[in-house]
Amino acid sequence: SDCKINKMNRLNLPPYEIKTRQQDGRQYILDVLRRKFIALTPEEWVRQHFIHFLADHKGYPTALLANEVELTIGGKKLRCDSVLYSRDLKPRMIIEYKAPSIAISQKTFNQIFAYNTLLHADYLVVSNGISHYCCKIDYTNRSYSFLSDIPRYEDL
């Protein structure tokens, strides 16, 4: 059952106990947040590793994290790969994933910046499982800065 997993890239993220299952010749991976098995794609592989990284290594409460979030803002429907909410359920961090084979470009960030004009999250993260970029938005000074690391939850 590991044949597909072995073909999946090794990521620049800590390993965790991955739960997968095979069904009708397709492989599925357990999404801990949605509590169900999801088709295993390269993006999903990155997403599940990243969520475990945030929860197990950076202290993010899983109760405030959500995957595949559809938000309607001003009549526009937005799909975010993952969202970290504040305790009063406002988006604090938006996370977008790419397959490990996809290089993260300015275009990737333009997409997440466009989302954020509607969402007003404080942090924007993009990861392809190999490189992770975290951008902190300063609304007061209308600027942003890239952080050298993904912050711990308590430091947000």
Language model feature labels by segment:
Residues 8-123, 130-156:
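A short, conserved, highly charged catalytic patch centered on acidic carboxylates
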